[in-house]
Amino acid sequence: MNLLASPIAVASVSFLLAAVTTTVLVPQVRRLGLRFGWTDLPDERKQHVTPMVRLGGIAMVLGFGTALAAVWSMGGFGLLAPAKDQLIWSTLAGSLCFFLIGLADDLFALSPWPRLAGQVAVACAVWSQGVRIGAIDLPWFTASAGPIALPDTLSLLATVVWLVGITNAINWLDGLDGLAAGVAGIAAVGLVSVSFSLHQVAAGFLAAALAGCCAGFLRHNFNPARIFMGDGGSYFLGFTLAAVSIVGPAKGLTTVSLLLPLLILSLPLADMSAVIMGRLREGRSPFYPDRRHLHHRLLRAGFSHRRTVLLIYVFTQWLAALALVVANAEMRFLWLALATAILVATVVISRRQLQHERALLNTNPCSTPVDPAALGEPRG
């Protein structure tokens, strides 16, 4: 029996290979970064107190690429049409380019506008290779006419906004240990489920590999982190999530595939939009670092570092479950009920713990240490 004849088996192998490879490579990357001084030094606005290597994205990219290459060499891509096979490699190339832009920023501190220009250029390049929004299917308005084909100019604009927007939303989310990797991993698992329910096998393979490298990296990045993914890692995660969401339908963007990433990533997207609007209202650059982000607000409200991250995790998994309902996936209502129960329980327990800690603080304010993570760290 050929296990790789099953799409689920291929996705499972892809996930495991990416997770194991990333987990094994992270310590090597960390040692390399410490040896050459490629670290993020602590200062008065940052929460870490020792130099932290910011090159964890290297291990993630290598884990992702290794998993896809291994599955391909074992014949796993034989389940795909040649056009879908090409889309996987185009997505991998785009992910690598976005990673290199972020890596250059990690090493040389690029200014925002050159980074943005590079992102737009790469997005245009992958659009030319077929990773594009070519049509929009809105069944409520186009039931008889079918999908609305987009002119090339509009298709290019929509694709660039989609890819660059989601990439930077994930990048700006990378403000606490484990936050970006965890949210991206949850989103990737949601994409695996929906992709297979819609028979979008290529997208499922990509999402499974992405979920694997997120899981492997979290082993070293969850609080207290031993390494940061850096802008290279967050750009890689954001671009890959955005690209996977349009690789499934390839030439067109259906209502379901549009709502899925918007639902799963609505929290970081809304946070990014609110932060940009707030900065612009004050006459500041949209790239000006501050403490407006949701995770900074939760920290200031008194939640600990870990509790803040877990709250955002459970809300993201609830949004992913809601996306499964929209996609009409199997057992969708069971997953939504379970996700809702987890969300409600986490919120209730977190509020009670916070109230208890505040009561202790009011009773004996000198006996309760201040959580240094409550200071936050603006990274975007």
Label every model-predicted segment:
Residues 28-53, 274-306:
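Cytosolic, membrane-interface loops and tails of multi-pass inner-membrane proteins
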Residues 28-32, 348-363:
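Membrane-interface capping segments at transmembrane-helix boundaries
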Residues 247-254, 336-357:
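N-terminal hydrophobic signal/anchor transmembrane helix of membrane proteins
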Residues 2-272:
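"…together with the soluble PPM/PP2C metallo-phosphatase catalytic core" -> "…together
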Residues 213, 239, 301-322:
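Hydrophobic membrane-spanning alpha-helices of multi-pass integral membrane proteins
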Residues 320-338:
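Extracellular/periplasmic helix-loop-helix junctions in multi-pass membrane proteins
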Residues 291, 358-376:
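Short, highly charged, low-complexity non-transmembrane loops/tails of multi-pass membrane proteins
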